[in-house]
């Protein structure tokens, strides 16, 4: 049992949690321990670590910055280390207090996505001298052992991935498919750039097409 189970292990506790984090009444919530949510999660449901709410500013429906970041990298919330939720929350606060419009692209420009076995994906500053967020904890031990499973209206129509994925994974389309696409256009469009296209086809042997991480 994780350290956060006591917050939601009773009906009264769950109601307080729902009220504190402003989770809509039409959203279903139930607790799942580490290693249990894989079998407990049903189609259309999402699993989120409790630490994401306590320290990561997670909201239901999910905030635009967090949702777009997860969609961009094809990650589910269960794959993210607490460090990632802290960074995204801090950037959200910067947007609100300083009237900024930082997006997941800005996050990706400053931070690199790394994976640590047993910990999940986390964010590391590309350059130590350039950091949006300071004083992040160096240890996440014991913080990702409690999860909540959300059902029904947990998203606004554009959900984040609910199944664990892998950044950069996907199906491949070889150069033959690329040639077929190019030949579907009038030849006159390419005559003046023939050598460029020929070089382009030779250099690109395959194109990565992202899988559909939103199917359950």
Give the residues covered by each predicted segment.
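Residue-register detector that marks a fixed positional context within folded domains
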Residues: 1-216
């Amino acid at each position: 049992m994780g350290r956060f189970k006591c917050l939601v292990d009773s009906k009264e506790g769950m109601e307080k949690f729902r009220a504190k984090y402003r989770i809509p009444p039409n959203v279903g919530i139930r607790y799942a321990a580490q290693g249990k949510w894989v079998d407990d999660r049903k189609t259309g449901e999402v699993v989120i670590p409790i630490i994401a709410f306590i320290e990561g500013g997670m909201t239901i429906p999910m905030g635009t910055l967090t949702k777009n970041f997860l969609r961009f990298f094809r990650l589910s919330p269960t794959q993210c280390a607490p460090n990632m939720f802290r960074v995204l929350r801090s950037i959200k606060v910067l947007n609100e207090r300083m009237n900024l419009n930082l997006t997941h692209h800005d996050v990706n420009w400053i931070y690199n996505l790394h994976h640590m076995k047993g910990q999940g994906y986390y964010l590391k500053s590309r350059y130590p001298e350039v950091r949006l967020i300071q004083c992040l904890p160096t240890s996440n031990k014991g913080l990702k052992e409690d999860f909540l499973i959300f059902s029904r209206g947990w998203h606004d129509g554009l959900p984040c991935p609910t199944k664990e994925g892998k950044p950069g994974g996907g199906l491949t389309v070889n150069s033959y498919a690329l040639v077929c696409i190019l030949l579907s256009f009038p030849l006159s469009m390419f005559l003046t750039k023939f050598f460029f296209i020929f070089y382009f086809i030779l250099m690109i042997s395959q194109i990565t097409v992202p899988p559909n991480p939103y199917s359950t």
